[in-house]
Amino acid sequence: MTYYHASPAGGLQVLELRKSPYFDKPTQVCLTSLRAMALFYLIRNYEYAYGYTRQGKLYFDEPFPDALKKLYAGKSGWLYTCEEGNYEKTEIPNEFVSSQPVRVLDAEYIPDAYEAFLHEQEAGNILLLDYAHFASDPEKFAKKRAWLEKAISEEIRKKAIWKAPDSDCARYYLENYPEIWEHTLEEVIFHGKPEN
């Protein structure tokens, strides 16, 4: 089996254990057996909107208009092929983790992550679902928006992101989910009451 790891950093010979600054996961090396899935991690982001169909097909579901292009166009990074090992399988399809450093076997420079996703779609390795795909179905769209509002609002509250409005994370949520940001602030700061 081939194992991949993606990073904005080049020149890595060994993947060292890391703790994600954004997700509540242990210190580890994350790997995937699916090249298209690895591409998501060419950038550091606060959310990764991919999933799998019932048939096991990887998809990217844009959480806001033009998300894939906005997040990945013009972004470069490195796709590493790693040595085989006795890696632990996670609950996420095609994801593996290692509690030990992992040796890199090969590296591929990806000059534009967005273009790489388009090539993966052409090859049939991923479904890229644009925002309009769900917006055209009112019932699915309402469910998706409700889920996003709950998840993002909880994240903003739990990590007190609203207390640092100039942070990269706060700007990300404010720029891409302005209604959710404002609604959450109203609840947190004004406890649901209008400002006097």
Task: Give, region by region, the residue ranges found by the protein language model.
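Short, well-structured hydrophobic secondary-structure segments
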Residues: V29-Y50
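ADP-ribose/NAD+-binding catalytic cleft of ART/PARP-like enzymes
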Residues: M1-P26, Y41-R44
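Conserved NAD+-utilizing ADP-ribose enzyme module
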Residues: R44-N196
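A general structural signal for short secondary-structure junctions and capping/turn motifs
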Residues: P21-Y22, V29, L68-Y72
